Curated annotation (Swiss-Prot):
UniProt lineage: Bacteria, Bacillati, Actinomycetota, Actinomycetes, Mycobacteriales
Gene name of the encoded protein: clpC1
Leader sequence segment: none
Protein name as catalogued: ATP-dependent Clp protease ATP-binding subunit ClpC1
Region annotation (Repeat 1) ranges: 5-70
Matching PROSITE patterns: CLP_R (PS51903), CLPAB_1 (PS00870), UVR (PS50151)
Region span, II: 479-670
Length: 848
């Protein structure tokens, strides 16, 4: 039976349960159903009872007088009484007798009257409403209109007079009266848009085809134009042809929802159109106009657009539509007959200055809602920052959202109880536990003392809460430009908020931080540090990326490692680096994988490997590894990124690169490093050799890349070849990783100077850079140490010292061997492991 209930009838049942709980009754009787019918307020039953002077308060007081309040609030499910069940069964019988295939609020009321013996019937009689009179009122309302629920269910009753009611029951069911909302002050003020509103008035005043359609991007204010028209009608600021018009917005979703049988949807729509024709003063607003095309078109049926076309052409129906440019092109323009019936009105995105005026006009509404004060600086910041940093949405929508969320954020912070209140709660709970324990132990003197302590704490907490609520909550919080910047930073991940003193110090020491991982390469470290400082200080070109560099030089000197160190410095994680291996894009057709496949190709829906990552993380470091291996077409696509900081992906979306650091690595010009012609990179071999090599690399880059590509790069940095001294420093860096792993096993690792020197000697290769050192440490240290751990020669709680035998520090060291000695950590020096982890020479063990 319940599947036949309309939404309003189901709501009545829910409200009946709530009324029973409010009265502490553990059952749902006829009186609770009557309260639910009145409480629902919108159905035919509620309107019938209201017309007879029956109010919710009057019924509730009569129920309390007859039955009274219950002793205890019910828990869990509340059952229906047998009499209430009978009422629901009678409501089904009433519906069938009226020829309805649904059960609405009117049928439930008729069931209550037909039952006639319950508390509900007694209450109605006491309030002066004879049952026969109530029944006549319901039938009279149904004869004028076959029920609001009938429109909801899509079916009518039998017979009845074909008069139209004084109220717009169908339009109220499937739409919203915007002029009534404007009269009640429920609509936000509309700032500007005078030209668009005037153009809409002109189209509406035409004799035929007087149907404007507002076309614009999402969030530019199409609906606001219609609300502005509703306010103009209310204030009388419209021509004579539009005075006294009623502007209704139609909800197509409600029209379609619940139309179970063929013809239900069409019947509902025809009822709406009939009521509009009868009234003669209705202007219909259909948001998302493209949903008309195909709406309700099941097999063999016609859609809503086809039903509306004749009336739109003859001028019998005045409609305002609103849709986006893409949807208009995709749906409306394809249907030429529908398109010619609408006159397009373009709604463009407002300027930043216009957006600021809009925000100032809305300020009072948001201040009242969030109970905050919004400064002028916050308005300016919201408009300018949203315009600059949020590129996939449009003004003023994105700026309004910034203001709204900043206000919500501030209000939530103020509503959070201070920590000392939570401390009071913990102390009170602890006192209660101790008191109960004392009572269980029959220590009543202690229990009495704890009871007094509990009372004191409760009183202190109440006083502190009173101070908090009367103090902090009464002070109106202020939303300023800093709050707006913080919200934007949380949205996009772009740090646009003001620099704190700690971050300023950290940025000024950026080179020092990067050199903890990068040995040497002063030029490269300085270049990227300056780019980041320029960005955070707000002095970078707003239309270009934060920085674009080519890192050239031999393999294994730190080009990729510097990119990872930069990502770690900015985001605290090496994985924050967007790394693209350009060796995967050596063919022309593979370029589509980077930026997104075009329509019709495999992978179109997935987006590009580069564009999708940057779109989701606009503040990032992007590394194009070994750029020379990519196809030439990719360089052409990157020109726009380097110059304008944006790129269009395969789906036509603009991806913003203005807050990224772009790094290209290349090995061009380094193939001659192994030839003994004085072309090496070693600084020890003289700065002239480095300058000659730098010139060679630049010449190779000019041969391989087009001038327009190189001309857009901020800086080309040629990395130095690592010297022997830098390799020794790199030993410390790499050993610290091994020491960190041993620390988790309660072990420390210390290398003597001789061990470091031998590792550097065996791992130093001027051609291959630092990578041979990593393999040497793995072979000489990690492999041998792992065997000693497995053989239990060293173990937890020990300091492992690595030294060298059979080497005086001068010769080739072919016969030299590494030795491993484990000694107990001295209890007085618990930080040995930490010292060893930094490989700073640590304290020597007592003996070997």
């Amino acid at each position: 039976m319940f599947e036949r209930f309309t939404d309003r009838a189901r709501r009545v049942v829910v409200l009946a349960q709530e009324e029973a709980r409010m009265l502490n009754h553990n059952y749902i009787g006829t009186e609770h159903i009557l309260l639910g019918l009145i409480h629902e307020g919108e159905g035919v039953a509620a309107k019938s009872l209201e017309s007879l002077g029956i109010s919710l308060e009057g019924v509730r007081s009569q129920v309390e007088e007859i039955i009274g309040q219950g002793q205890q609030a019910p828990s869990g499910h509340i059952p229906f009484t047998p009499r209430a069940k009978k009422v629901l069964e009678l409501s089904l019988r009433e519906a069938l007798q009226l020829g309805h295939n649904y059960i609405g609020t009117e049928h439930i009321l008729l069931g209550l009257i037909r039952e006639g013996e319950g508390v509900a019937a007694q209450v109605l009689v006491k309030l002066g409403a004879e049952l026969t009179r109530v029944r006549q009122q319901v039938i009279q309302l149904l004869s004028g209109y076959q029920g609001k629920e009938a429109a909801e269910a899509g079916t009518g009753g039998r017979g009845g007079e074909s008069g139209s009611p004084s109220t717009s029951l169908v339009l109220d069911q499937f739409g919203r009266n915007l002029t009534a909302a404007a009269m009640e002050g429920k609509l936000d003020p509309v700032i500007g848009r005078e030209k668009e509103i005037e153009r809409v008035m002109q189209v509406l005043s035409r004799r035929t085809k007087n149907n404007p359609v507002l076309i614009g991007e999402p969030g530019v204010g199409k609906t606001a134009v219609v609300e502005g028209l509703a306010q103009a009608i209310v204030h009388g600021e419209v021509p004579e042809t539009l005075k006294d018009k009623q502007l209704y917005t139609l909800d197509l979703g409600s029209l379609v929802a619940g139309s179970r049988y063929r013809g239900d949807f069409e019947e509902r729509l025809k009822k709406v159109l009939k009521e509009i024709n009868t009234r003669g003063d209705i202007i219909l607003f259909i948001d998302e106009l493209h949903t008309l095309v195909g709406a309700g078109a099941a097999e063999g049926a016609i859609d809503a657009a086809s039903i509306l076309k004749p009336k739109l052409a003859r001028g019998e129906l005045q409609t305002i539509g609103a849709t986006t440019l893409d949807e208009y092109r995709k749906y409306i323009e394809k249907d030429a007959a529908l398109e010619r019936r609408f006159q397009p009105v373009q709604v463009g995105e407002p300027t930043v200055e216009h957006t600021i005026e809009i925000l100032k006009g809305l300020r009072d509404r948001y201040e009242a809602h969030h109970r905050v004060s919004i400064t002028d600086a916050a308005m300016v910041a919201a408009a300018t920052l949203a315009d600059r940093y949020i590129n996939d949405r449009f003004l003023p929508d994105k700026a309004i959202d910034l203001i709204d969320e900043a206000g919500a954020r501030m209000r939530i912070r103020r509503m959070t109880a201070p920590p000392d209140l939570r401390e009071f709660d913990e102390k009170i709970a602890e006192a209660r536990r101790e008191k109960e324990s004392a009572i269980d132990a029959q220590d009543f003197e202690k229990a009495a003392s704890l009871r007094d302590r509990e009372k004191t704490l409760v009183a202190q907490r109440a006083e502190r809460e009173k101070q908090w609520r009367s103090g902090d909550l009464d002070v109106v919080a202020e939303v300023d430009d800093e709050q707006i910047a913080e919200v934007l930073g949380n949205w996009t991940g772009i740090p646009v908020f003001k620099l704190t003193e700690a971050e300023t110090t950290r940025l000024l020491r950026m080179e020092e931080e990067l050199h903890k991982r990068i040995i040497g390469q002063e030029d490269a470290v300085k270049a990227v540090s300056k780019a980041i400082r320029r960005t955070r200080a707000g002095l970078k070109d707003p239309k270009r990326p934060s920085g674009s560099f080519i890192f050239a030089g031999p393999s294994g000197v730190g080009k990729t490692e510097l990119s990872k160190a930069l990502a770690n410095f900015l985001f605290g994680d090496d994985d924050a680096l967007i790394q693209i291996d350009m060796g995967e894009f050596h063919d022309r057709f593979t370029a589509s994988r980077l930026f997104g496949a075009p329509p019709g190709y495999v992978g179109y829906e997935e987006g590009g490997q580069l564009t999708e990552k940057v779109r989701r993380k606009p503040f990032s470091v992007v590394l194009f590894d070994e750029i020379e291996k990519a196809h030439q077409e990719i360089y052409n696509s990157l020109l726009q990124v380097l110059e304008d900081g944006r790129l269009t992906d395969g789906q036509g979306r603009t991806v913003d690169f203005k807050n990224t650091v772009l790094i290209f690595t290349s090995n061009l010009g380094t193939s001659d490093i192994s030839k003994p012609v004085g072309l090496g990179f070693s600084k020890g071999g003289g700065e002239n050799d480095y300058e000659r090599m730098k010139q060679k690399v630049n010449d190779e880059l000019k041969k391989h890349f087009r001038p327009e590509f190189l001309n857009r790069i901020d800086d080309i940095i040629v990395f130095h070849q690592l010297t022997r001294e830098e390799i020794i420093r790199m030993v410390d860096l790499m050993i610290s990783r091994v020491a960190g792993q041993l620390k988790s096993k309660d072990m420390a690792l210390v290398l003597t100077d001789a061990a470091k020197a031998l590792l550097a000697k065996r791992g130093f290769d001027p051609v291959l850079g630092a990578r041979p050192l990593r393999r040497t440490i793995q072979r000489e240290i990690e492999d041998q140490l792992s065997e000693k751990i497995l053989f239990e020669e060293v173990g937890p709680g020990q300091v492992v010292t690595v030294d060298v035998d059979n080497w005086d520090g001068e010769g080739p060291g072919e016969d030299a061997v590494f030795t491993f000695t484990g000694t107990r950590k001295p209890p007085a020096e618990p930080d040995l492991a930490k010292a060893g982890a930094h490989s700073a020479g640590g304290p020597e063990p007592a003996a070997r």
